[in-house]
């Protein structure tokens, strides 16, 4: 199979524009989404790169991913956050979650954050590296919408 080389910056700009214009993402949401997807491909994680665009588009068209939604903090302590995603795209929600988590961890020595009701956030390693870049340990996990239909079921529920 022949490989195609695409300029990183051009692909990132194209993807950002596609999310902004095609899927009505706000500029900042489109920017982080494009950045993480293209970075996944650049690192060899094609399963979490730009090939996922059709999945994110289908979620928007089905109303499962709401680009204009705003996440909100619903519970907060010095070492814990719960963020209600309100079906916002996972990438901008994760950026906010990691920024707040790392600020609290620097102040208090640790922090755990839970994001609920958001969408897939791409390559988990990207988010965990945010902690490593600041000399901390970070774990990043996500769930996603159902991807497979179990036997005798009428809807996708297995991820």
Describe every region a protein language model picked out.
Residues 87, 117-121, 142-148, 152:
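Acidic, glycine-rich active-site loops and adjacent beta-strand->loop/helix elements
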Residues 94-107, 114, 120:
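Glycine-rich beta-alpha loop segments
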Residues 48-102:
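Active-site cofactor/substrate anionic-group-binding motifs, chiefly glycine-
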Residues 158-159:
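Conserved small/polar residues in nucleotide/adenosyl-binding loops
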Residues 1-23:
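Generic N-terminal amphipathic, Lys/Arg-enriched alpha-helix
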Residues 24-32, 47-49:
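Flexible, glycine/charged-enriched surface loops at secondary-structure junctions
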Residues 83-85, 106, 111-117, 138-142:
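General beta-strand structural signal in soluble alpha/beta enzymes
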């Amino acid at each position: 199979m022949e490989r195609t080389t695409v300029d990183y910056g051009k692909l990132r700009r194209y993807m950002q524009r596609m999310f902004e214009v095609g899927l009505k993402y706000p500029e900042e949401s489109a920017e982080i989404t494009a950045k993480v997807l293209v970075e996944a491909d650049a690192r060899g994680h094609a399963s979490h790169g730009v090939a996922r665009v059709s999945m994110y588009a289908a979620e928007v068209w089905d109303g499962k991913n709401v680009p204009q939604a705003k996440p909100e903090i619903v519970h907060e302590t010095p070492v814990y956050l719960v963020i209600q995603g309100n079906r916002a795209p996972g990438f901008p929600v994760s950026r906010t979650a990691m920024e707040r988590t790392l600020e609290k961890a620097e102040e208090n020595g640790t922090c755990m954050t839970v994001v609920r009701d958001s969408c897939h956030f791409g390559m988990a390693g990207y988010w965990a590296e945010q902690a490593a870049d600041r000399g901390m340990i970070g774990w990043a996990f996500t769930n996603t919408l159902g991807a497979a239909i179990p036997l005798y079921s009428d809807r996708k529920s297995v991820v």
